[in-house]
């Protein structure tokens, strides 16, 4: 049990545990239980917008008799609810609001239930008419989310206080006549428990740890200790709004697009037993609170939380195994929930994330202070987009929003990576690991907004682009109008707990009664009263403040956001050589509020800058400089090498990773990603003029201008027509052993290509290409040492790509003018066959003395397309066209210098099936069976998943009959 504290003091507990709540098992009708589940989800959203994930609070409660009436005339959709409590009148003005429910959402049960196995609820009837939202005492800062079916349930917020209302249980309930027309209700009025709660300092813990860095989104952490890893570089304020980290390439970047998080809510048996018939309503109320939080403009994105399915587990053996081990429970739930999800995103019941609510006290690795747990950055991973929430009352709404934040790749606000963005206000936002008080004007921190924007901009939220077909409508009533302060205390501290009135903490902190050593004490978990909780005559709590209900119109009407003007262009990422600069605009003209839509469209624009050539830096490329910058930080030794010298690695790097700073340890062969992104403006690869922008490769011309169409001609002239150079070529054969010169290529040569084709069907014929520098040193295959794999050779600012000596077509190519002369050689070893080596390159023509202006045509090429295969032997194609000086089609181009339109690629062998030896026969006589292992292996012998191998080539006979001898 949670220790109690004396009256007047405040109990603070870390965010992951809200205390041991008395488990009251109650058996009620299943439909009502499911309604409470829906209401809980609705309240989750409202409270998340007002507070934090699992904060201790102070509460008091009162028995009230709600007065409900419909507005006459044209405003017939408006419902007014009056509550007299805590020495004040609370007037709730409510409008129907079931927008968080999918129109055709499915409610399912697992195991024993009083009703049918699955219910498909019509959103226009059944549940949808139950839910309302609105304001309290007209206060524009207030909010309410209520259900008016089977009594009043829900929460509302007024002037820093949260109010929770629900029907009074047992003998405390007396039914009277309601103030509604008889045709609308045949029931009599019912006493309700109204709880009022204020928030204090302190908080509970989330199960996500911040002591390590976060991996890329496609990593798969298996334990809590690796769940919250982060990229190497810290985000900086000027990076706000820009994507960071690796990810799939998106066609539209820096664009604000509407996202829809289709959600399945799951309640285990402990939830069904505790909440009984009110379960579904309770869950939807929580979720509606969370949904409103994700509509706040401080998140800087258009994110809509919707419920498409609710599943209640009535027999725990048929659900996921739920234990006090939060990490294990999360793993079990993630594995279990996948079986209930349709693989097709077009299925109306397909969900993007699943949330398990349980009354089980969750524990972390050291303490039981865990209120929730989720993996980080997994929203579109069907196997890991899930979270576990410990239900400790309506404050579980905060936990829900917080854990969903982790699923959206948000770290805790006090993580070191957020320090430069959040400043000193890291404990006043939803993603605070220990929330003391919520900044209602900005519930999401700058770091949270930056991280979710980066996450979505880098293509990790593509599954959220489809608008749900049949979302479940969420209740619009404020939670405080559904669950009073007393009921809120019962949710948190047990059925015997009541609200402790405290005028100083009205709306800010909910205090509740308890006993310690036989004495009556007040205790709190420092959560505010639920929005909609009455805080005086005509007033209610909204966002921790007690406000007039008459001000409802100021915050009940949604205001849609609109883009403001573009800001000034920022600093250029490079001082020369072609950098990138940005301009941004904000959704602040006006800022969306009251659930209004966030702006859609491009939020960031970028352009090229400082495109002039850089001064010669010993012939080093810009990527070389970035790799070498890590030399002084790399003191670890590899083998006998005293230190590490880093050089760029291009060969073997996946196209999607070209804009990571992948560097190779010189002379060793190890390579690492030293930075998740190169500096903006860095060329993507030596054979392309495209440049990197925020970790993604974008097209640029040879003039270093983004979106320019200019290309280098064969002479290496940007935008040239190929008329300023001439082709030099030759074919050489040799039979003598040792090293022999083929050709010395002078400085200034462009488009160098040397080909050495081995005999058909042979990987090598005893002859290999080599390169010697002008000073006599070898930069390739010298001293009878061969490089068998594809690699890039960086020499004096020139990058040469070598195919590797084991390739069927041994080849050397260049992509920029040669800075110094190089000699191409052939190495003959053993009884080598006579090699045939062909070379071509282009040299600048000498200046002519006459003034004739000839008509020129040239071959114009486009960039290489994708390889036809990822392994084995594939091909790449590109468009090669003959055009005149004006860019029009022509036919005068010399065919002998026509660039190739195809080239081989993907030389690495494909994964293949490998069978093991047969096992002994299962019988020593007569007909038995034998079997052998089957596995998928890579070209280097590593074991892969079976999906990596060709299923059409899978051996069929890895089990067979056998007969050693006939039985006598």
From Swiss-Prot:
<feature type="binding site">
    <location>
        <position position="345"/>
    </location>
    <ligand>
        <name>Ca(2+) 2</name>
    </ligand>
</feature>
<feature type="binding site">
    <location>
        <position position="262"/>
    </location>
    <ligand>
        <name>Ca(2+) 2</name>
    </ligand>
</feature>
<dbReference type="GO" id="GO:0016525">
    <property type="term" value="P:negative regulation of angiogenesis"/>
</dbReference>
<dbReference type="Pfam" id="PF00090">
    <property type="entry name" value="TSP_1"/>
</dbReference>
<keyword id="KW-0325">Glycoprotein</keyword>
<dbReference type="GO" id="GO:0008201">
    <property type="term" value="F:heparin binding"/>
</dbReference>
<dbReference type="InterPro" id="IPR000884">
    <property type="entry name" value="TSP1_rpt"/>
</dbReference>
<feature type="glycosylation site" description="N-linked (GlcNAc...) asparagine">
    <location>
        <position position="946"/>
    </location>
</feature>
<dbReference type="InterPro" id="IPR010294">
    <property type="entry name" value="ADAMTS_spacer1"/>
</dbReference>
<dbReference type="InterPro" id="IPR041645">
    <property type="entry name" value="ADAMTS_CR_2"/>
</dbReference>
<feature type="disulfide bond">
    <location>
        <begin position="489"/>
        <end position="512"/>
    </location>
</feature>
<dbReference type="GO" id="GO:0001822">
    <property type="term" value="P:kidney development"/>
</dbReference>
<feature type="binding site">
    <location>
        <position position="402"/>
    </location>
    <ligand>
        <name>Zn(2+)</name>
    </ligand>
</feature>
<feature type="disulfide bond">
    <location>
        <begin position="572"/>
        <end position="609"/>
    </location>
</feature>
<feature type="region of interest" description="Spacer">
    <location>
        <begin position="726"/>
        <end position="850"/>
    </location>
</feature>
<feature type="disulfide bond">
    <location>
        <begin position="576"/>
        <end position="614"/>
    </location>
</feature>
<feature type="propeptide">
    <location>
        <begin position="49"/>
        <end position="253"/>
    </location>
</feature>
<keyword id="KW-0677">Repeat</keyword>
<dbReference type="GO" id="GO:0031012">
    <property type="term" value="C:extracellular matrix"/>
</dbReference>
<dbReference type="GO" id="GO:1900087">
    <property type="term" value="P:positive regulation of G1/S transition of mitotic cell cycle"/>
</dbReference>
<dbReference type="GO" id="GO:0008270">
    <property type="term" value="F:zinc ion binding"/>
</dbReference>
<feature type="disulfide bond">
    <location>
        <begin position="587"/>
        <end position="599"/>
    </location>
</feature>
<keyword id="KW-0358">Heparin-binding</keyword>
<dbReference type="GO" id="GO:0001542">
    <property type="term" value="P:ovulation from ovarian follicle"/>
</dbReference>
<dbReference type="InterPro" id="IPR002870">
    <property type="entry name" value="Peptidase_M12B_N"/>
</dbReference>
<dbReference type="Pfam" id="PF01562">
    <property type="entry name" value="Pep_M12B_propep"/>
</dbReference>
<dbReference type="GO" id="GO:0060347">
    <property type="term" value="P:heart trabecula formation"/>
</dbReference>
<feature type="binding site">
    <location>
        <position position="412"/>
    </location>
    <ligand>
        <name>Zn(2+)</name>
    </ligand>
</feature>
<feature type="signal peptide">
    <location>
        <begin position="1"/>
        <end position="48"/>
    </location>
</feature>
<feature type="compositionally biased region" description="Polar residues">
    <location>
        <begin position="214"/>
        <end position="229"/>
    </location>
</feature>
<feature type="binding site">
    <location>
        <position position="406"/>
    </location>
    <ligand>
        <name>Zn(2+)</name>
    </ligand>
</feature>
<dbReference type="InterPro" id="IPR036383">
    <property type="entry name" value="TSP1_rpt_sf"/>
</dbReference>
<feature type="glycosylation site" description="N-linked (GlcNAc...) asparagine">
    <location>
        <position position="783"/>
    </location>
</feature>
<dbReference type="GO" id="GO:0030198">
    <property type="term" value="P:extracellular matrix organization"/>
</dbReference>
<dbReference type="GO" id="GO:1904754">
    <property type="term" value="P:positive regulation of vascular associated smooth muscle cell migration"/>
</dbReference>
<feature type="disulfide bond">
    <location>
        <begin position="535"/>
        <end position="546"/>
    </location>
</feature>
<feature type="disulfide bond">
    <location>
        <begin position="334"/>
        <end position="386"/>
    </location>
</feature>
<feature type="glycosylation site" description="N-linked (GlcNAc...) asparagine">
    <location>
        <position position="765"/>
    </location>
</feature>
<feature type="domain" description="TSP type-1 1">
    <location>
        <begin position="560"/>
        <end position="615"/>
    </location>
</feature>
<keyword id="KW-0645">Protease</keyword>
<keyword id="KW-0862">Zinc</keyword>
<feature type="binding site">
    <location>
        <position position="262"/>
    </location>
    <ligand>
        <name>Ca(2+) 1</name>
    </ligand>
</feature>
